[in-house]
Amino acid sequence: MIILMMCLLMPQAKSEGALPTETRSDAETSVRANSINATNEHTDDMHLTEAQYFDALSVLELEEMVQLRKRSGQYDDALRHLTILIKRVDDLDYHYEEALLYELKEDYAQAAQRYEAILTAPELSPVFRRNIQFRYGIVLSDMGLDRDALAVFRTVSRAKDLKSHEKLILEYARGVAYIYAGKTRKGIRKINKTLLKQNSDTGSWIEARARAALVYVLIEESERLTFEKPKKTAQRFQKRSELVGAAEEQIVVMINLGEPEYVLRSLVLLSEAYFQVAEEMRVAPPPPTLNREQQIRFQKKQLERADFIDERGRSYCAKGVGYSDQMGFKGQARLELEVCANEE
């Protein structure tokens, strides 16, 4: 039987697996060069009913259709094929693939339920169980349940046979969860230490996930520097520019890593940061030491600067949409960027 754990586990049988070194977005980015038209000779017979179509497919063909539709971003259709496959062969690998497809759809609640169900299976090998626990922790973090995710990661980290790169993957995951759980300094320390230790076996997806968390921290810190005090406006604008610039540098690294999921998430945050700065500049009060004429000039200049910054943020939205199309990646972040890019 073909093992359907291509996206996240390393390409060995599940008894020999390891913590995931590939991203769930690999399923989407494999379609970068050409969009796959997921059809075969069975779909040419348009007179076939749906039941007849599925009956005509062998187990091997169903597996192939699941993978084709997944690679082309047709997750609902992939799930339809997978449901038929599970009815024919109730295999844990297929249930894993089902959970993964829900992750790709960003339906994290459904993915979490399925990972939980798999973990109740008595026949899981220790390594396969560890993989599922890890994915479950990632999904919990994506649902905003970072304290629960940290508990899961701690359980995984107790395994005696973890390889060095698996420990690094876990440290990245824990650092990210710490940040989103509000333990920012601890999370940053973990991520920075892991960046110094990582190797080629660690996997680009988890590094990109960690860098996206750093972008979140940088943007959050920049937004705390408001322009309410006129005397500090110039100083705070400079500091915010530096923080946003540091966030941009992290995004460039993620682009080079080839991880669109986290690039797009970060571009949403970055564009929102620009819009926030622009909005605050429009309402920032002029220094009280200026006379009326100087205040008018100050406000006019602030409005011009705000318009420029606003346009800069919108340009990042448009670039994100273009990058998403180039990479063949779909998701909520892409939709948000598209809405932003098309706003007047």
Model-derived segments and spans:
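Short coil/linker segments at helix-helix boundaries
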Residues: 220-250, 276-312, 316
